[in-house]
């Protein structure tokens, strides 16, 4: 009887690992997620209160969760431009954030778009060789435009002796354009490790600041040729504004009004977090908004044109603020060769073991062989993922936002799923904070991948 019971338990355990849903997640992994969420709720770790009436003794509105221990310092690069550097002591990572406002591909020749795509691939390949680089994230954010920037530009451009018709026309544009307009911004976060190489000496924040100051100009110069528009490193003030508005969208108008008046608000890193948040199984309530975050479970198959994410990245009327974050983790050359060769062996075995191989098996084998050939010729290999965050300021619009993301992800040929039980962490990971998620896991990423 004990032997039979042991065999049954082993078979049951193997069955929990073998059974997987359409997203490739096993029954065991889903069960572990449920137990983890139940433990989080029982310990009330999904609720956060800050400020003078909060639970923390120091009374500030510091960032919650994964970014709670982060620190912000500011340095100047070789061009004397201030840039912010985020330090996460628990992981020993340092992050700089580059901001841009891309022009998009409208009214742009196809040849120019192809050049931008090629330059972006070259930039990713070059940045992967940067010493100590851990990860790169690209966040494209769409939000309602307050119109204050346009108003300030028009007012500064009107002269006293201008024709009356021109003044009236500009006044009309000033009042009508902001209605329904949206602003699109992009942020590139580059995360470096304190140790330049594995087993090397860990450098201090001051040493990293001085070193990155000499590397920032080269990184921004390379981005200028990728279609990113005018790029510049974010200062500490600018980064504080971005994170503050992400957690409290209602503050966007106040911050824009202060900047338009020439009196930018003085924000500090311990004050940019939410005053309150509450994470649920499939949503995240923070200050004046509610957000839902999805993760990519399957990338687009087949040929991927440059416009495949166009509709997903574009503003949507049912979503107040939307962030699409691409996460890249470069793989060193030694591991990359072994990975692509293993993929070729697996694909070839699957193809040869079937009497009538499917079209997908044939395509997978061709793709694996092509990837191995490109890697052998010097191309880099990266792990990549995607997070999509939809934020609404009216909770009655939450279901509309969910439906919109489902439709938009389908047009991009993406398979996405809700981040269950970790909405607060996923929200922070989608921000330009440079968080390297595998370093924050209690269970090693290699073990989780097998489950």
Please report, for each region that a protein language model flagged, where it lies by residue.
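Extended, folded cores of ATP/NTP-driven motor/assembly subunits in large transport
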Residues: 2-451
């Amino acid at each position: 009887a004990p032997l039979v019971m042991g065999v049954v338990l082993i078979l049951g355990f193997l069955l929990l690992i073998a059974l997987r849903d359409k997203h490739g997640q096993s029954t065991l992994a889903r069960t572990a997620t449920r137990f983890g969420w139940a433990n989080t709720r029982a310990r009330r770790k999904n609720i956060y209160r800050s400020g003078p009436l909060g639970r923390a003794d120091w009374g500030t509105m510091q960032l919650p969760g994964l970014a709670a221990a982060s620190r912000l310092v500011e340095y100047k690069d070789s061009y004397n431009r201030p840039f912010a550097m985020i330090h996460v002591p628990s992981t020993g990572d340092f992050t700089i954030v580059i901001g841009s406002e891309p022009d998009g591909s409208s009214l742009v020749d196809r040849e120019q778009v192809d050049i931008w795509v090629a330059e972006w691939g070259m930039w990713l390949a070059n940045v992967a060789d940067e010493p100590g680089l851990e990860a790169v994230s690209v966040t494209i954010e769409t939000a309602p435009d307050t119109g204050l920037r346009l108003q300030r530009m028009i007012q500064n451009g009107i002269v006293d002796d201008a024709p009356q018709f021109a003044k009236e026309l500009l006044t009309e544009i000033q009042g009508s354009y902001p209605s329904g307009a949206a602003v699109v911004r992009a942020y590139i976060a580059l995360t470096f490790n304190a140790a330049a190489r594995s087993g090397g000496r860990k450098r201090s924040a001051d040493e990293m600041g001085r070193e990155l100051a000499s590397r920032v100009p080269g990184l921004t110069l390379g981005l200028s040729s990728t279609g990113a528009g005018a790029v510049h490193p974010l200062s500490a003030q600018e980064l504080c504004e971005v994170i503050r508005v992400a957690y409290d969208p209602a503050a966007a108008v106040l911050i824009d009004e202060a900047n338009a008046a020439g009196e930018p608000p003085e924000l500090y890193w311990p004050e940019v977090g939410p005053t309150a948040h509450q994470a649920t199984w499939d949503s995240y309530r923070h200050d004046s908004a509610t957000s839902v975050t999805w993760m990519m479970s399957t990338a687009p198959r087949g040929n991927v044109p440059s416009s495949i994410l166009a509709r997903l990245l574009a503003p949507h009327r049912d979503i107040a603020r939307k962030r699409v974050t691409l996460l890249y983790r470069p793989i060193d050359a030694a591991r990359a060769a072994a990975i692509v060769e293993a993929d070729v062996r697996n694909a070839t075995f699957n193809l040869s073991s079937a009497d009538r191989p499917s079209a997908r098996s044939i395509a997978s084998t061709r793709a694996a062989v092509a990837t191995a050939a490109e890697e052998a010729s010097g191309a880099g290999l990266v792990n990549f993922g995607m997070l999509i965050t939809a934020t609404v300021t009216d909770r009655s619009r939450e279901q509309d936002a969910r439906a919109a993301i489902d439709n938009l992800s389908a047009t991009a040929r993406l398979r996405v799923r809700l981040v269950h039980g970790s909405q607060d962490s996923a929200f922070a990971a989608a921000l330009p904070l440079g968080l390297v998620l595998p370093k924050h896991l209690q269970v090693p990423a290699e073990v989780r991948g097998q489950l």
